[in-house]
């Protein structure tokens, strides 16, 4: 249930994204130099498809830098993208001028993508001068992230509410569930004890109270049996 803030939401193995990562490294393309001749990078195309609109992207090595860059351009229209989050529909996520997303690539914890509405930027391209601390990704990592986003687009068409609510009889005693995301009902002062209790039950939840746990896709309902039979009191 700890899925690295959504980076491992498609699984910890990485699948075809890690295969491409390995293949590019094997070809010796290990630097951050330009390895493809195209007006728009494949990663930018993938992000635009995911968000259903043309986007200009920048990468950052911290959540803080990405958020500050978004706010410097669009202080009232910067938001966070989480797949399968009902909040996306409420705020019409595809109309947000600046969106921050974490690519669904496990073990890449220090990469954050800021996706800016292309039309809004073209209206005033000088806005980009306000961006600070953007980084250039090594090509192999960029390829892997591109594949992970396409894998997410595919998964968005396959995973539905029915894949998560089957665990509600156990989980909703301790969390409020929004899609696959679990926000703790357990008071913050009791959260560390609760996390340790879950470990005793063979379950790894988010160690950070402010970072939601995530319902594991396709998990056997039996994995929560120990928690069901040994409830945590708070």
Please report, for each region that a protein language model flagged, where it lies by residue.
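General beta-strand structural signal in soluble alpha/beta enzymes
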Residues: 1-2, 56-60, 82, 99-102, ...
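Glycine-rich phosphate-binding/catalytic subdomain of phosphoryl-transfer
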Residues: 45, 49, 53-55, 59-68, ...
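Active-site PLP attachment segment
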Residues: 68-150
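Structural signature of PLP-dependent enzymes
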Residues: 129-171, 187-189
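Conserved PLP-binding catalytic core of the aspartate aminotransferase-like
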Residues: 163-197, 213-219
């Amino acid at each position: 249930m700890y899925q690295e803030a959504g980076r491992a939401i498609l699984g910890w193995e990485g699948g075809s994204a890690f295969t491409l990562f390995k293949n590019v490294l094997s070809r010796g393309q290990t630097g951050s130099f330009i390895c493809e001749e195209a007006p728009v990078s494949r990663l930018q195309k993938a992000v635009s498809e995911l968000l259903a609109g043309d986007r200009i992207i920048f990468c950052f090595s911290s959540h803080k830098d990405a958020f500050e860059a978004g706010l410097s351009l669009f202080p009232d229209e910067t938001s966070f993208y989480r797949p399968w989050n009902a909040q996306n529909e409420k705020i019409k996520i595809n109309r947000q001028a600046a969106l921050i997303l974490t690519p669904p690539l496990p073990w890449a914890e220090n990469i954050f993508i800021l996706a800016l509405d292309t039309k809004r930027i073209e209206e005033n391209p000088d806005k980009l001068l306000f961006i600070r601390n953007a980084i250039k990704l090594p090509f192999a990592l960029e390829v892997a992230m591109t594949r992970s986003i396409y894998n997410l687009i595919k998964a968005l068409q396959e995973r539905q509410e029915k894949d998560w609510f089957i665990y509600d009889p156990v989980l909703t005693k301790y969390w409020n569930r929004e899609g696959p995301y679990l926000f703790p009902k357990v008071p913050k002062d009791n959260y560390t004890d609760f996390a340790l209790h879950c470990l005793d039950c063979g379950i790894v939840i988010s160690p950070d109270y402010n970072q939601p746990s995530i319902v594991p896709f396709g998990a056997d309902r039996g994995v929560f049996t120990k928690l069901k039979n040994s409830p945590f009191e708070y």
